Amino acid sequence: MNYKPNIFYWSPFLVPIATPKAVVNSATALQNYGKKYECSIINFFGEFNPYQNELKDKNIKLINHFSEKLLKILPKHGKLQSRFSFMVIFILSFFPLKKLISNQKPDFLIIHLITSLPLILLIFYKFETKFILRISGLPKLGIFRKFLWKKALSKIYKVTCPTKSTANYIESLGIVDKEKIITLYDPIVQISKSNFQKKKSINLPFEKSEYFFTAGRLTKQKNFLFLCKAVKRIILDVPNFKIVIAGEGEDKDKISSFIQKNELEKHIFLIGYVPNIFPYIFSSKGFILTSLWEDPGFVLIEAASCRVPVFSSNCPEGPKEIIKDNFNGLLFESNDENDLIKNFSKFNKIINNNETKKKLILNNLILARQFSLFNHYLKLNEILSNGCN
């Protein structure tokens, strides 16, 4: 029987975000297309329990440690509260993770979230395992953190980045050899799965194609309060404008208060966290993204795979790189309300013209295919195969 390299994924998280989906999809891609790897996801606090049936069906192992009861009591919302929780996870996981890597000796450990823990382990201990750091968003490095990263990355096998601009940024920091930096697109598009999911029914108080849609954590990054302020002006020209916002987060009360205070309840609909956003995207007139930064912006790719036109801020790193203005979507200047209003008017005209709308959608669909599970597998398999030689 041929030996199968063991791949461990490290990605502890507190609330549903895009990264865990990327981890599951990455492991799925290796299991489905390669059939020569044994993939396991480290599930220290039961954070991946919602995926356990899916992972079992795909023969992806979960490595459990602490009870999920601990995860339930940790604070999840607010900058200080979430930092406290991450510190608790760091302290409780330090020696168990070291023991796991030392005893199990996986061929590769792919690090997604709470990256500081495995990187510090890499500085102070010697492992047979090759560490792969997955960058998600631009890291903020002070003098001390930059020193630690440089020390750890001297022993890292590879650093993978979700966009070319992020790869260029990491290279510019001078903290890791250029040869170790690789652009690896996230595994987002799974056409068969999204085609099935988008057909599920949704419950909204209006007809299909009467609304625009957006989704994400209700945080400063997603800039939804800015969007609500823009809606207040948009409805002066488009009185029947409606937008559905899916997500939870620390800014929810602030956003809800603004909607009520400005009597926008018939135009802005907060529907909370939705496990399956595909039918909401598919039934919408278009997808709007107002983020201050994304890397790359999962929902943009998911909207493209649903054949829905995209209107996005030109924020770094993903949207600015992924969306080509007037080619596969329309852009507006990030956090500029006047520019959003001006360009939304153009966007509305484009999507109300079948010919221009089809061109926009087709171009975006073609671009989205580079974020398929198969393309992710091809690149990651190349990285892993070189490391096995």
Language-model-derived ranges and their functions:
Residues I17-T28, E210-L236, I243, E250-S256, ...:
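A conserved mid-protein helix/loop that constitutes part of the nucleotide-sugar donor-binding site
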Residues I89-S93, I111-L117, I135:
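Short His-centered aromatic/hydrophobic patch
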Residues I156-I181, I188:
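A short, active-site helix/loop in glycosyltransferases that binds the activated sugar's phosphate group
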Residues Y273, L292:
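Aromatic "clamp/platform" in nucleotide-sugar-dependent glycosyltransferases that forms part
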Residues P309-S313:
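Short hydrophobic beta-strand element within catalytic cores of glycosyltransferases
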Residues D325-N326, L330-N338, K346-N352:
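Conserved acidic donor-binding segment of nucleotide-sugar-dependent glycosyltransferases
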Residues E355-Q370:
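A short, well-ordered alpha-helix in the C-terminal region of glycosyltransferases
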